[in-house]
Amino acid sequence: IIDVAKMYQDSFFLMYTNGTLIPKDVAQKMEEAGNITPAISVEGMKEETDARRGKGIYDQILAAMKNLREAGVPYGVSVTATRNNVNLLLKDDFYDYYFKELRANYMWMFQFMPIGRKPDVELSLTPEQRIALYKEWVKVLTEKNYFVADFWNSAILSVGCLSCARPAGYFY
């Protein structure tokens, strides 16, 4: 992937990853390419992430973030909001931790959508939780100046995605 990115220096690549394959040498290669930003998937903090992604994964994620910071690679965080983690996502401390302490540059939020072979609607946010989360994001954006983008709901507010040539569309 890094070799492909190097071939297209007129483009910038956002890649989603769990971060487990970003040791120091890979982070350095990303920095040398200069046109890659990884969005590292978490479910919240250590407890939530390890519960969903496997024991020990969160520690590997923290190591990857450290490697990226030290190499000078801008990175972000990708979070799927579910009923299991929404209470955490409604706390300022959650955002402060990732933006201030771990120095993430951006955060993508995805609201869980029950799709696939065995969709579990019980993980979907309630309407009240969606409203509360939206209000938290507005606060985080306007008062803390953290770049948090709600992948689904921002479309309503910004006339859709720029990739569809919508005037004033959002940037994803």
Segments from the language model and where they lie:
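Radical SAM/AdoMet-radical enzyme domain recognition
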Residues: I1-Q111
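A C-terminal junction/extension of Radical SAM enzymes
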Residues: F112-Y172
